[in-house]
């Protein structure tokens, strides 16, 4: 048994178990993953080093740093912002409060687009409202003949996209450009075989009803879709269809209860063969 002053020392594994228990009691569904990520971040260890050193004792300084992160998380701050990174479709991504945290549900959008794009061979793909670049980067990593452009209006988000392109060694396949999804595209952009978009779609009045961890930490620019939540869908469907080749495809993520309205918008603008795929949230 070891002691740190008046407090008993603890191993990395025991500290992890204690943090996991705290998070579970607080209602966090991903308590095991989040506890491990907080211990790794606070100690400066990789996941492999965490497992290797699980039975080693934690120094008081490192324990204090880890517990400070845990306290911030228990107060609502998302783990992805605390550690500065997150994973999407198997890719490690830099994350900051300038971008939304990639959700597992959005992997459905990426998967559907990837399955189609793989059938095309060489093609051009636009990820509009790219945020961290997660969807476009997943497409590029899984459809190596595609050339992907990430379009994002926020300059801090554009910087995150650049970091993630480099981090995943996709500089030869992916580029990023500042662009406004609610403005008509420049003809100089050319045409794309596929456009994917996970645009802001929360109605303005609903922002205040979101969970504290979303409302108070994630960027409202990336959440708010205008008064009714449809501003970006309206603009992209009407204005960006001109950037698609004949027969090209447009993929959206939509919010709960929005699919029928977006379908009507697309049909009104001449889109056909429209399908809806539900994620695990319905």
PLM features: residue spans?
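Conserved AdoMet
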Residues: 40-115
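Active-site beta-alpha loop architecture of Rossmann-like, nucleotide-cofactor-dependent enzymes
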Residues: 80, 202-205, 257
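Residue-level signal for inorganic ion chemistry
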Residues: 38, 76, 106, 135, ...
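Mobile active-site "lid"/loop adjacent to the S-adenosyl-L-methionine
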Residues: 201-231
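Conserved hydrophobic residues forming the short capping helix/wall of the S-adenosyl-L-methionine
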Residues: 23, 117, 165, 240, ...
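Conserved SAM/SAH cofactor-binding pocket of Class I
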Residues: 107-209
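Non-catalytic accessory regions of SAM-dependent methyltransferases
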Residues: 2-51, 55-58
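Conserved Class I SAM-dependent methyltransferase catalytic core
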Residues: 227-282
């Amino acid at each position: 048994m070891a002691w740190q002053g008046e407090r008993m020392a603890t191993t990395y594994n025991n500290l992890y178990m204690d943090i996991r228990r705290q998070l579970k009691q607080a209602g966090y569904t991903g308590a095991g993953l989040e506890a491990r990520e907080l211990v790794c971040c606070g100690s400066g260890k990789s996941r492999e080093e965490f497992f290797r050193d699980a039975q080693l004792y934690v120094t008081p300084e490192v324990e204090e740093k880890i517990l400070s992160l845990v306290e911030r998380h228990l107060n609502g701050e998302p783990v992805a912002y605390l550690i500065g990174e997150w994973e999407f479709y198997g890719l490690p991504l830099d994350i900051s409060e300038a971008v939304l945290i990639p959700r597992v549900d959005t992997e459905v959008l990426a998967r559907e687009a990837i399955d189609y794009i793989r059938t095309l061979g060489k093609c051009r793909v636009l990820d509009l409202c790219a945020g961290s670049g997660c969807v476009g980067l997943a497409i590029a990593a899984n459809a190596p003949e595609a050339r992907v452009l990430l379009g994002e209006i926020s300059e801090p988000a554009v910087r995150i996209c650049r970091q993630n392109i480099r981090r995943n060694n996709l500089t030869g396949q992916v580029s990023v450009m500042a662009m406004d999804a609610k403005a008509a595209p420049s003809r100089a952009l050319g045409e794309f075989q596929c456009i994917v978009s996970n645009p802001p779609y929360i109605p303005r009045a609903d922002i205040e009803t979101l969970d504290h961890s979303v409302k108070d930490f994630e960027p409202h620019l990336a959440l708010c879709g205008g008064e009714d939540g449809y501003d970006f869908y309206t603009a992209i469907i009407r204005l960006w269809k001109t950037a698609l080749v004949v027969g090209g495809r447009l993929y959206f993520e939509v919010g709960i209860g929005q699919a029928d309205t977006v379908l009507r918008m697309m049909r009104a603008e001449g889109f056909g063969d429209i399908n809806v795929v539900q994620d695990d949230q319905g």
